[in-house]
Amino acid sequence: MSGTVKDIVSKAELDNLRQSGAPVVLHFWASWCDASKQMDQVFSHLATDFPRAHFFRVEAEEHPEISEAYSVAAVPYFVFFKDGKTVDTLEGADPSSLANKVGKVAGSSTSAEPAAPASLGLAAGPTILETVKENAKASLQDRAQPVSTADALKSRLEKLTNSHPVMLFMKGIPEEPRCGFSRKVVDILKEVNVDFGSFDILSDNEVREGLKKFSNWPTFPQLYCNGELLGGADIAIAMHESGELKDAFKDLGITTVGSKESQDEAGKGGGVSSGNTGLSETLRARLEGLVNSKPVMLFMKGRPEEPKCGFSGKVVEILNQEKIEFGSFDILLDDEVRQGLKVYSNWSSYPQLYVKGELMGGSDIVLEMQKSGELKKVLTEKGITGEQSLEDRLKALINSSEVMLFMKGSPDEPKCGFSSKVVKALRGENVSFGSFDILTDEEVRQGIKNFSNWPTFPQLYYKGELIGGCDIIMELSESGDLKATLSE
């Protein structure tokens, strides 16, 4: 053996090597991961020191079939084979453990001692080991970095945006901002005395680029409250100058440091005040006319076609998803309405959604109402929308995602083997899909059997058309036609 590291190009090649019975060490890596690059130095020196073993690299994201076969969820990741079997694994940047595990697999079979760190190659070995170890520890705290897939990145961004009630994605860190806009937002948050988390987007290009698409917001900084985008520097500055930022935090249950108000008090809603204290009769009449100008009326920042804050955009998205006609008013264009409506409704932030003149609430309440089905119920009760037939409901569900899976359980926790197989096949092809757990709704479960003329589950739909159940999906997967079928 040459003592060099080679790249694996196919699963078949790896299977042949593994079945040869020789010691094989596999390094799963990613080009964006600094820890992978650092551990690759160690890996190369080990290949020189242990010529009896095969040393191979696999770029995890370029060979998902290999990564999935060995349950690779993070890089760097190492798999050790001996006599055709997997005998050990290692996740993360740990040079000492890697050297010891390689020694056990590829060293002398009679040796009772594990490989010493100095086995990293000639006199330079210990120096290289310590340098790499310190670099890995300093930059990544010896943690593995998650393999980037569309679903994994989305999940990571959701966790990051929800990691603190107030979360700022910025250039640099609060103590040392690396752009004027980031510095300005940090100063504002400190001025309103609110605790906040932060993430330096300069340190992680995957997050930097991913967040632009995730939030549909192309620049930084980005400020999030309770997982929802508030906006960038301009919006944060404008809200702060008007006093609205502090009010928004209060309405969302985010209290400032040292505040005596409890979250319950801060989260109290509004409701149109009978007295409208402090409003002139003329303004009160104008506001009453505006909130009743359409059956469903949204007071927002910007227009439905161009929202000027993330919360307003979210409510517009919900109303469009529910196919609800609504009127809107841009409060940024009329400060009299903007300030007066806060008093009229006893609700201090925007957006505000009204149904037949009655305040429903802001973005967080509207979102919860949609999730629980309460929004549709209220609109039906008030005569805004008619009672939805089962057929219409099924059509809406089937078309809610381009690829839609009706299954038992959820993709992360399937409750039958057939559903699990289909989920695995879709994920194996990196197909994004929506899902519905038929165990949670007997009406949908029975109704869709008749609707589709298909008596079993799971059922997979593409653009509203039934593709089939588990057997058909597995046949398409095995023939290599699944992704093509779901992208025509």
UniProtKB/Swiss-Prot annotation:
| Function, as annotated | May only reduce GSH-thiol disulfides, but not protein disulfides. Participates probably to the maturation of iron-sulfur proteins and to the regulation of the redox state of the BOLA proteins. The GRXS17-BOLA2 heterodimer binds a labile, oxygen sensitive iron-sulfur cluster.
- Which protein are we looking at? Monothiol glutaredoxin-S17
- Is Cytoplasm one of the keywords UniProt gives this record? yes
Q: Which GO terms describe its cellular component?
A: cytosol
Tell me where in this chain the Glutaredoxin domain is found.
154-256, 284-386, 391-488
Q: Summarize where [2Fe-2S] cluster binds, as residue positions.
A: 416
Its domain of life?
A: Eukaryota
Q: Mind telling me how this protein is modified after translation?
A: Ubiquitinated at Lys-154. Polyubiquitinated by RGLG3 and RGLG4. Polyubiquitination of GRXS17 leads to its degradation by the proteasome.
- Would the keyword Transmembrane turn up in this protein's UniProt record? no
State its location(s): Cytoplasm
Gene this chain is encoded by: GRXS17
State where glutathione binds.
Answer: 408, 445, 457, 470-471
Keywords assigned: 2Fe-2S, Cytoplasm, Iron, Iron-sulfur, Metal-binding, Redox-active center, Repeat, Ubl conjugation
User: In this UniProt entry, which cysteines form S-S bonds?
Assistant: none
| GO terms (BP aspect) | auxin polar transport; DNA damage response; reactive oxygen species metabolic process; regulation of cell cycle; response to heat
Family the UniProt entry places it in: Belongs to the glutaredoxin family. CGFS subfamily.
GO MF terms listed in the record are: 2 iron, 2 sulfur cluster binding; metal ion binding
User: Which residues are in the Thioredoxin domain?
Assistant: 2-107
The scientific name of the source species is Arabidopsis thaliana
**Cited InterPro entries:** Glutaredoxin (IPR002109), GRX_PICOT-like (IPR033658), Monothiol_GRX-rel (IPR004480), Thioredoxin-like_sf (IPR036249), Thioredoxin_domain (IPR013766)
What free text does the record give on domains? Answer: The Glutaredoxin 2 domain is sufficient for interaction with all BOLA.
How is this protein organized at the quaternary level? [2Fe-2S]-bridged holo-homodimer. Interacts in vitro with SUFE1, BOLA1, BOLA2 and BOLA4. Interacts in vivo only with BOLA2. Interacts with RGLG3 and RGLG4.
